[in-house]
Amino acid sequence: MQLGIILKGIGGFYYVKQEKTEDIFECKPRGVFRKNSVTPLPGDRVGFSIIDGDKKLGNIDEILPRSSELVRPAVANVDQIAIIVAAKAPNPDYMLLDKLLITAETRNIRVLICVNKIDLDDDTAKIVRNAYSPAGYDVIEISSVRNIGYKRLKEELKGHITVFAGQSGVGKSTILNHIMESWVMETGSVSNKIERGKHTTRHAELLELKYGGYVADTPGFSSFEIIDIPYNQLERYYPEFLPYINTCRFNSCSHITEPGCRVIEALERSEIDNNRYQRYIQLYKALKDIPQYKGKKTESRRVIK
């Protein structure tokens, strides 16, 4: 059995890079995967058998254990997420950014926040840095026009499987073309009407970096929902809350209205970004209204920490 990594899957075929030779084989998964409702994903490390060495055809026989799995984008074994926001065109969707950060936190995946197109608006980069640096997130400013940020980004990508995610039209493909030092992805303009990218990525695909590691460009999106987190566990995925949540007066503190809330006190001292905090309240209330949690007592947060 040969070992390899899935680079992409299209129409039921999966393109596997062989570990030893680095040849790429077009493979079909064995029927047992469908029978067990298992779908191979880009990033999966697999065992496969060669059917035709000349034509580079094979069958996927085994999917090795995954260290992580993202649903949207559907990529396995990711250990880093680069979330791309644009300084302008389109304007940043901070709620989407927060949801992506929460998704990464639930899976213990490292995050880079990249602010692209800073040549269009320097102030946005400052806003993002001031809001997210206190939470411990790295913020990288990028501009193709000024050729800024790419050297540092390449250093951060070395040795990782990194997924690029963000709104449509923020310039993910343009960034990838720069860090790959060749044209690898079609880039598209942004529709003025809906501020979404045109002619952009349609599927997740791993691209190998010559200096080590892989990156995955993924279809851009304008909406993203988190529904699998109990509302009283949401606090766990805000790193800037963690120093305070165990010291609130009430064990079941929601950090919204309760007296003696250390998170609110930190907010009042400007140690927590107010806009990000307001979005926390929106997400908390939205999760609380989900039918599976509404009217029910969920597990005590004192137990889950």
UniProtKB/Swiss-Prot annotation:
Cofactor binding remark: Binds 1 zinc ion per subunit.
Residues reported in the UniProt entry to bind GTP: 116-119, 166-174
CP-type G domain mapped to chain residues: 67-224
Single annotated GO MF: GTP binding
Subcellular location: Cytoplasm
Protein family according to the UniProt entry: Belongs to the TRAFAC class YlqF/YawG GTPase family. RsgA subfamily.
Record protein name field: Small ribosomal subunit biogenesis GTPase RsgA
Designated gene of the protein: rsgA
